[in-house]
Amino acid sequence: MLSRVAKLNSRLVSLALLGSQIAFGAITYQHPDDLPSGVDYDFIVAGGGTAGLVVASRLSENSKWNVLVIEAGPSNKDTPETRIPGLADNLPGTRTDWNYTTIPQDALGGRSLNYSRAKVLGGCSTHNGMVYTRGPRDDWNYWAEITDNQALKWDNVLPIMKNTEKFSQDFLDQSMEGHIDPSVHGFDGMLSVVASYTNVSFNNLLLETTRELSDEFPFKLDLNDGKPHGLAWTQYTIDQGAERSSSATSYLESTGDNVHVLVNTHVTRIVSAGNETDFRSVEFAVDANSPKKVLTAKKELILSAGVIASPQILMNSGIGGREELQAIGVDTLIDNPSVGRNLSDQASTLLMFDTTLPNTDYDVAAALTEWDNSRSGPMAYAARLNHLTWVRLPDDKLSGSDPSSGHDSPHIEFQFRQISHQLPPADVPNQVQLPDPDSIGVVLQFSVVNLYSISLGSVTLNNNDPFADPIIDLNMFGDQKDIAILREGVRSARRMFSSQAFKNVVHETVYPPAGVTSDEDLDAFLRTSAVSYLHGVGTLSMSPHSASWGVVNPDFRVKGTTGLRVVDASVIPRAPAGHTQIPVYTFAEHASALIADSYN
């Protein structure tokens, strides 16, 4: 797939003009030496990802405050391929990716997994599949309870989510009627959202299934009403111009020139600014061979480097478990063993069914030309199939206690991908043994996801080199209940495609083979096929002020420090039953208001 991306480079050169025509209010600098002298920054945001740019944008609304954002990756203006919805699956493994790999996973037979994380301005909102899900109300109420932060309750965050959303009721002349519930959406916010869909016969057959098997797969008018159970039209962060809407294109582009953005620059450490607990200074460099520089924020430093890099930066700064830091030669300034622990993610597997349905393939070069000329065609869509299904398993299929946050929360997600002879590029690492393409015909392909993994992983350090990749251990299937739930998800999917609606057009599974039906055989298949769904959170988890666990307090301040907060996916205590993009936006909006209010 990378070779295909290389072939597209010549087409993307013509699209580079798109970036040069966009005027940021913020001022972007390509190198630390380019930063203006004599500017004192009130706030420094270490990491220009989804959350970091929300925080920078909101703080800059006070025109008296100067804000600096430091981002390791390039500007999204310099990566025009990230703006095209139809290229989303091509981005992992490219220049906008950290290209992490996990350590071998014991329960997966020693397989290591690719762990894609965005390395570009806008972070994962510039690099992800653009799916817009808020998660169940149960998750938000659970987070509020375990963190002792009532501001996170569903009834309190729903207005935030609606206020930040700019939902479009039509897209490329497609009406949204019957695809969403307008009452649960906002229409005047920063982040553009649509419910775009392709007109394929598969859609109608899915809807027939919701009538035939309504108990397991009811039709859900809107997956973002707080009770996502059933089959619904997918919503995406795409704007009316058929381009990706990210924190870079929505929030950052609305700021004034009191925001400075330094790209292609690596944050190496957080540094004490004068006493043992005041961490308002940040150390950074272009690469390992470049000189390091230090800047100090007048008010606060906000760490927003993501679920992997944020704990890595804290540990390199001396904030972490004492024994672990001493072992790699880092002086311990704040002893907190919770740093880097509690990595909560979702396990998924690809399923393929032999089918006679029309395929969803298209000519990529022609589609790029169409998008370039008219912002229409296949590249205007984030996916070739446009439904999500959320399944709640019955109690007798849970192998013990219910891991979900409540009765309105699903355990399983189906994300439909494509109908094709080609295999999908993004979520199938090289370590997974897929069928030989020559041995299969046209196949329906989709992901089955265990939304509530009990197993927790970690991010630790190999050494004290801030430019070295950290050790990522997902501990996938460390708890047997996780593989049991995913196994039931596979069986649920087979029931869906054994329905009368699909009887004559969808046939036996080819991955896993049709004969793989017993618990033992399905588990063996999952151990060789499961991958991360790349929704990791929790490595710097929020917890109550008085808690003996966790890394940040409900006000996002790092425990035991002053002048330092963390705002990104790492503070979310547990992965939601959904995609993480919108919870990250919402946490960032909440944090921004707290920070601003503390100085007004």
Curated annotation (Swiss-Prot):
The protein's required cofactors: FAD
Gene3D superfamilies: FAD/NAD(P)-binding domain, Glucose Oxidase, domain 3
Post-translational modification: N-glycosylated.
Signal peptide span: 1-25
Gene Ontology cellular component terms for the protein in this record: extracellular region
Catalytic center residues: H535 (proton acceptor), H579
This protein's UniProt keywords: Carbohydrate metabolism, FAD, Flavoprotein, Glycoprotein, Oxidoreductase, Secreted, Signal
Catalysed reaction, written as an equation: pyranose + acceptor = pyranos-2-ulose + reduced acceptor; pyranose + acceptor = pyranos-3-ulose + reduced acceptor; pyranose + acceptor = pyranos-2,3-diulose + reduced acceptor; a pyranoside + acceptor = a pyranosid-3-ulose + reduced acceptor
The keyword Signal is assigned to this record: yes
Record-linked InterPro entries: FAD/NAD-bd_sf, GMC_OxRdtase, GMC_OxRdtase_N, GMC_OxRtase_C
Cofactor binding note: Binds 1 FAD covalently per subunit.
Glycosylation sites: N99, N114, N199, N275, N342
Function, in words: Catalyzes the single-oxidation or sequential double oxidation reaction of carbohydrates primarily at carbon-2 and/or carbon-3 with the concomitant reduction of the flavin. Accepts only a narrow range of electron acceptors such as substituted benzoquinones and complexed metal ions and reacts extremely slowly with O(2) as acceptor.
Family to which the UniProt record says this protein belongs: Belongs to the GMC oxidoreductase family.
Protein's recorded name: Pyranose dehydrogenase 2
Primary gene name: pdh2
